[in-house]
Amino acid sequence: MSTKEQSVILLRKAALAMMAFEWIQVAMGSVSISSVLVLACVIVIPFPFYAALLWPIKRLASAAKIRKVVFWCLAFRAFMPIIGNVFANELLRIAPQVAVGVIAIILIINFTPDKFAIKFGFAQKWLFIPAIVLFYMAGFVPPSIHQTAVSSEEYSDDSPNIVLLSWDTVRADVLSLYGGTGLDTPNLDKFASRSVVFNDAVAHTPITGPEHSLMLSGLLPPSNGLRANVVSKMPDSVVTLPEMLSGKGYATGGFVSAYPMLGRFGFQQGFSVYNDIMGNQPLIRFKQLSPREIFWAGLLYPFLRASTKAFTSGPVVQERAIEWLNQQNREQPYFMFLHLYDAHAPYTPSPQFEKIALERIHSATPAAFDGNDAESMARYRAEIAMLDSFFGELLIEIEKRDPGLANTLIILTSDHGECFGEGGIHFNHVPSLFEATQHIPLVIHFPKDAGAGMRVNETVTHLDILPTCMFATGDDLESLPQDVATYPLQLAYSKRGMGYDMRGVYLEAQQTTLGDDRLRGWRTAEHKYLISRSGQEQLFDYRTNEVENKLSKEPKLAVDIKATLLNFFNALPILDGSVLSISAQDERAMGDLGYTD
């Protein structure tokens, strides 16, 4: 057998081995696997694999050439995650062609008859390098960017652009808009002067996933199937706000910054682009990559795991959103959902903001409920000051497309607040239904500055976001999904008020890790009634304080509010979400975010 014939056989075997190994890695990455298996896959296997793969070439090439081949293969593999991040958008567009090219190369190398392979030079060593290049390009596409083709109707010329901006974990009372001191938010204050400020906006839950599912579906968590972070998925049967807007011809983009907001929990529904890649730097994406993608650079995996994050900093997420926005047709209306997580613990503000906040630690109001939490609350304020600086930059980009915001609806809110000693809860929110977590900011800019400077005292909730957006596109309320009464917030300026005197609000804290401490509650104009899964009851005059449990002093009032709560809950349509198994990665990510048992 000639040397050329031998090279054909050896290269085919090498390519076949490469393909088989990659498919094993794909299969392993698609199921829940132990960390031991992952380490074996990404560290132990590559050495014999590359030795077996390159040995035939070493036998047929000079030492100088083999070093080049080895260097190319290893360098390409090590830098693959970085390249995948940098060129994510471009690679997404060509992913199908790349996949076809990979298959074609493998088929050519492995199944071309010998005489044709030898005649046309398929056995040449240079073919091996592009084969590796194409094959590994299949692993470039970040798996966490969801792109969906959404059928749509023709949009109306006067359809407004819609921006939903969520500042995670921002309680209302620390903002100057709501009476707080010691925190400068000049961009928010200027924005509020041309917007409508809602003084009594209330979150239904203190948990990131459920409250955002509520914003995007217009349904309470019991009715949309997502009542806790990570453990369940909002079913596809739930029609979401981006799905409705897509049906009206809107471009829809979602950009989120924390693990509970991953698309796999149902949040990507209706978005043409949903970017939920976690981490600021390319290497941080290791936690999101499959073993197939990191099997060579996996040498660093044990060291990187400790430093990886389950969230992404605000500037990175906002930059992704702005990049998407600038790619959209200026004639087409858009819906952009932007979720920023910076105010969530752990509090790590930029030094310039931290310095100012710490200087005001004793004068800022409200003070931390527990004095020992004062320094943490100061850093929390510094994080919010950072968010305000990001907001100023975002508004500039939005106004480039719509000068004066003549045709743009912008909703700025938060999913919940944070406790600094309230109820014995520190730097957390999950077990709380206190005002520290449930009273949240809500500021809405309506097109052409309608209602600018108004302040609305009536109680509103995140359930009103969906009808507000759809009402802006011309829909009437009867066509919208509702499990309880909701209101388009345009009523605030069109009728100089919301049109109701008092609105009771259903509350719940149902994260599964709370066990028997899971809560349901009802908030009236003056009182708040809470009952735990174990049956423990509390009644607060929350306008005055939430320290004294008035259950024994006002038992009849407690009975009446409890009856209202139970009647309301029993009338709700209940939808069970898809139950998800909790992986080791889920547990690590939630631990990184402070969600521990």
Regions inferred by a protein language model and the residue ranges of each:
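Catalytic domains that recognize anionic headgroups
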Residues: 2-597
